[in-house]
């Protein structure tokens, strides 16, 4: 169908799987995991009309560094769902990766003898994502990340599952049963495994400010301008400037939404 100017935009697609580690699938279906395949990516990109803006890769898996080298000029590469060590992560960034998906989740942490992929990202100017639903990451780690990476490199994300906005209950995610209770979604058969988020991006931004003490201006930038730049759509989205779409949320001091303006037209 022809897209009208009043329609909400699908700006891009994150191909979070299947080029990930079978040991760090999180809530993804392990049956779908495979090595990175440039031909498969290009076939999907053609079907998507060029909308795939980000491809997630576990660089330690056989052949995946070669995929990064081959495809990084066609799409942005993000390190994700990985068991990679520091040295392999450095090789991935040197090969062309520029991004890290949901930092801290589904990856090795930081220790003084094994700094891991997080420190590699910090040293190589990568953008990093944070799920600020107050379930995935402790507020102190959120503040730490803003202080170390800066709001020009932090991208707030919701990582929301299809259950987002729906009542508590049982749902399906990638062919697996999930249980939703409040802001938390988990695999039904493995209740300690978080299955995405049940919170929208605006509420994640709101929680970062009101519950995690992130400065408002930093949280707003990390939810708009920085992610737009990270996937290359900042000529149209992410900030208010001449030539960009006039997409605005008006809120009160408690960040309750009062109006939504989409492409210059008030829709809420």
Per-region residue spans from a language model:
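Short, small-residue-biased leader/transition segments that mark boundaries at the very start
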Residues: 1-5
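Conserved phosphate-binding/catalytic loop of the ribokinase/pfkB sugar-kinase fold
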Residues: 21-49
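His/Asp/Glu-enriched, well-ordered alpha-helical/loop segment
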Residues: 117-129, 146-158, 164-251
């Amino acid at each position: 169908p022809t897209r009208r100017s009043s329609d909400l935009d699908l700006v891009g697609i994150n191909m979070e799987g299947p080029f990930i580690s079978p040991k760090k699938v999180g809530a993804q279906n392990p049956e779908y995991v495979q090595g990175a395949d440039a031909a498969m990516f290009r076939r999907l990109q053609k079907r998507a009309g060029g909308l795939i803006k980000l491809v997630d890769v576990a660089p330690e898996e056989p052949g995946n560094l070669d995929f990064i080298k081959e495809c990084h000029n066609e799409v942005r590469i993000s390190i994700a769902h990985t068991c990679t060590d520091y040295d392999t992560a450095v090789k991935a960034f040197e090969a062309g990766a520029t991004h890290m998906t949901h930092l801290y989740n589904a990856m090795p942490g930081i220790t003084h003898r094994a700094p891991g992929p997080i420190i590699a990202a910090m040293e190589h100017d990568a953008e990093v994502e944070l799920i600020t639903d107050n379930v995935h990451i402790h507020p102190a780690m959120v503040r730490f990340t803003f202080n170390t990476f800066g709001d020009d490199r932090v991208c707030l994300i919701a990582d929301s599952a299809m259950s987002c906005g729906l009542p508590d209950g049982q749902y399906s995610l990638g062919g697996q049963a999930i249980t939703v209770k409040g802001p938390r979604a988990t695999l039904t058969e493995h209740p300690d495994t978080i299955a995405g988020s049940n919170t929208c991006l605006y509420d994640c931004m709101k929680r970062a400010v009101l519950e995690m003490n992130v400065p408002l201006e930093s949280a707003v930038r990390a939810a708009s301008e920085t992610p737009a730049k990270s996937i290359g759509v900042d000529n149209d989205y992410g900030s208010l400037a001449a030539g960009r779409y006039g997409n605005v949320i008006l809120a009160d001091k408690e960040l309750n939404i009062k109006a939504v303006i989409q492409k210059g037209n008030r829709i809420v």
